[in-house]
Amino acid sequence: MKDLQSVSVGIITREQSPEGAYVACPSFGPYRYCWLRDGSFIAYSMDRAGQFESAHRFHLWVHSVIQRHRTRIDTIVDLVGRGLEPDPQGMMPARYCLDGSISSDGWPVFQIDGYGTWLWSLASHVGLSGQTSLIAKTRGSIEKVVEYLSACWRMPSYDCWEEHGDLVHPSSLACVYGGLTAISQYVNNAEIPLLAAEI
């Protein structure tokens, strides 16, 4: 089992992008992206393996991606606040190019579970590594993701298999709830536990 772990850690480390993204599959075109959901679980597994620097780089990459596309969140939150329905293809995507850009290939982008999973993974990383300073560094992105989830959790979205985009999925809501609950331990924002309780 130790050999399997060391080989797995080696592959993940080798294929992690210079920016910190975890590629789903480097040799298959449709999967040469980083999914927040998958990447967050990979970061957690790297934390469990003691590879804190790798997980740290991933979380900083997610932070840079959220900051890069923060106006997209602002637009979505504004539309929802005015009772308007955002274009599903204009939502925050489930996956990103490794450089943090957004692909326009028509992939079903609207999946909220990845954003909740990231909050959980970030909180887990801080708890396991003791790198509490990461919360201050990523605070702006944490707040933006909470705004996004608060605006969108009731809306139909794709599930973790990227199917059934016309439904609201308990598995997605569980990821959002779990992420909000986990990150609320580190962020002093009374709205976060209230939102989790509402979900």
Please identify what each model-predicted range represents.
Residues 1-199:
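Acidic, mature catalytic/reactive cores of soluble proteins
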